Amino acid sequence: MKKISVSILLGLLALSACAQKYPDQRPAPQDRLFVSQAVEEKIDQVAPQLTNPKLRWMFRNCFPNTIDTTVHFDEETGLTFVYTGDIHAMWLRDSGAQVWPYVDLCKEDEHLRKMLAGVIRQQFTLINIDPYANAFNQGATGDHGDADETGTPQDPNVWERKWEIDSHCYPVRLAYHYWEVTGDSSIFDDLWIKTVETILETFTTQQRKEGNGPYFFLRVTDRQLDTKARVGLGHPVKPVGLIVSSFRPSDDATQFDFLVPSNFFAVDILRKAATVLTEVNHNAALSARCTALANEVEAALKKYAVVKHPEFGEIYAFEVDGFGNSYMMDDANVPSLLSLGYLIPSMASDPIYQNTRRFVWSNSNPYFFKGKAGEGIGGPHIGTEVIWPMSIMMKAFTATDDAEIKACMEQLLRTDAGLGFIHESFHKDDATNFTRPWFAWQNTLFGELVLKLVNDGKLDVLNSVKVR
């Protein structure tokens, strides 16, 4: 009896020490913006299986971060506005990625399902307010509203009007997955049809076959990547079937305006839209338009986006212009070249993608950095020698080798600056030198990664991580 008591006491002391070292970083229950029973149950199911205390702690902190701190669900309107984190605006890209891992849990949680449907409807609404905007205010507040010249007066609902292809891709990706999981086709109503028509019109206009179109972007700034060359139109492109993206998912201006990862993403979501239009809406004409555009862009990618590299062989360029010029790099923000195997799983086995994957994680990529704190891909948005954990997570998502997955997880656990969250970026030699302490997308993405590895039977890999 005495031995049992001592054993229990030692166990309690160990738990107390662990709690002091790894305190709960979530808001108090009454301060959480949205509560999902399914999410809480998933955390309680998975966390005890993680034997590494720091990994368990970070999973508990990160996975619910989007619903804890950024989701504003209005049950009366049925719409959901999602902050990106420390910036109180809704990016179409970020919001679609932030709530993505909750979709698989919503079939048994009606409250969660309604909130997710609200995100989708909100995104469709925002696309139709301004198809060229990347981020929006919570209402017609006129907040932010830089004195940008973009070809039209900025709507007060718009936070920023940077044309990025992925702003149209993420909402369709989310809606399609929601439908796959729930079978709820109510989101594919007249607003959906209007949204697809808007996307098609914007994509075809930005193929630049009939001139430059109505959009340009000029900003008075000391950051070269916050404005476009050639009086806001960007460098010339040859109309070869690809779609112009004036800005990257980092919100930096493109150098050559055919952004290859985003064009691949566009092909994928156009085909998803075509499936819905056929199976749900029975709209053969609109479905055919989506398929035709997808086929055209895909053919152009095969012809213009592949470059022969002296070390890695045939790889995908990051940006091209249709004239034969290409930019050989990768940026951490998704969609990136590295992330194509994550966003479009069918590409993971593509030999050109595999060559590209090796290229981007090497010194041949000007934005690959390696230092005392870790290694990974950054981008010009923050500056040189700065790594984005998003790239490390994309490497883990697309890895098949257990040692590679383990190395990625150990890096992620070592570079939280002791705070239990994933940051936007950190210096390659000092993880305490980081940007954005509250960036919900990266936090929830970390939770998504842990869940994927558990579901893929990689719990032993997670539990082999030694970082404390």
Regions found by a protein language model. Name each.
Residues 1-21:
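Bacterial Sec-dependent N-terminal signal peptides
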